[in-house]
Amino acid sequence: MSKILSNQEVKGTKDWLPGEFFVRNYIFSKWREVCLSYGFSEYLTPILENADIYRAKSGEDIGIKELMVFTDQAGRDLAIRPEMTPSVSRMVSKIYQSSPKPLKLFSIANFVRNEKPQRGRNREFWQLNCDVFGENNFLSDLEILQLSLDLMLAFNPPKKSFVLKINSRKLIDDLFALLNLPENKKIALTRLMDKYAKLSKGDFVKSMKEIGLSENNVKRIDDFLNAESIDDLVDKITELKNRGSIEEIKKIMKNLSDLGYQEYLLFSPSLIRGFDYYDGLIFEIFDNHKDNNRAMFGGGRYNGLAELFGSVSFPAIGFAPGDETFKIFLESWNILPQVNIYQDNYYLPLLSEKLADENFILAKKLRSENKKVEQGLNLLKIGKALEYANKKGLGKIVILGEEEFDKKIYKIKDMQSGQEKVFDLN
């Protein structure tokens, strides 16, 4: 006897049943609608890439620990993409010089990471990536932040259900310049700061000292990460007061406030973003729900990634929300539509073997009228047909029995109201 195989999906992946697929498509359609309203164009890259493009810039976790790698028959290390930013940068590097600028692109694609599955994190997940290439100015930063806010507001969330946290890698670089850190310690400190919320104060201080920070610099890092506002930050670390990075953050927050987004904005110096390729503005959308108090998605500016591909350097900024965190947000705030996915469908049962051909003809006619028609393929009595339609939640049933055919008519019954309407078969 052959081995019986499990019918369960791989841990950290999921089968998309019709009801779940409807929810996913609802989220994706909103994403697509908002991106198109900003004049962005849709694209897609292969799910397989050379592993080195992620090892180089995706950070220690995603680029090494969580990368799903295999060797192909030619001996090349290939990876299933764990994120889109290096992939789209590779793609754009091929077309950048011949393309009108800026390039405003978005994609909705699936990704795989070899990480421990948990709430809001799966091994396989879907993600929107939205990026602007070819503009390195304040206005492109402003537009991508506005788009991320409008993406949230498209789902009509309650007031104060989320916040946009803003910081800048330039500001962090300005801080590091004050610390006189050697270059090789900056990456280690950046990654440590990214884990600040997950570590105890004692462990965090200990790790900073292991990197080589003095007592004075440990205090400066602590003051930086715990600043409650821009004014609070420059009061604590006065050397940052007139830096361009501070002025950029002030300006972008003022402009977003002037556009009507003031209630959603928060300067957050403890926001670091763990990807090594960020080099300017960074941001995160944060869910404020008490049961789901976490980052939903984030993004930022990454101007140096094209150099990996020997291409002319080009500026870029983008962000990437995932399907699962978005779904949890909608569920937590009770704003996910509760819809019967079959309520708009018509059910045309086979009520007589003699009418099989006529059923196909009628189904074709109804579909030509843009109706969604599920055609019965087995002979049923009307009672069983009604029972099936009711159990599945089909909105309407089309009745064509021998009696109706003799009269050259068919009936459509609304399953909710019970109302019937008669139509000419010809």
Residue ranges of model-derived segments:
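Positively charged, Gly/Ser-enriched RNA/tRNA-binding surfaces
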Residues: 23-40, 49-50, 85-96, 105-158, ...
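Beta-rich nucleic-acid/ligand-interaction surfaces
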Residues: 45-64, 163-178, 272-279, 380-388, ...
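Acidic, His- and aromatic-enriched active-site or binding-groove loops in soluble protein domains
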Residues: 63-74, 181-203, 287-289
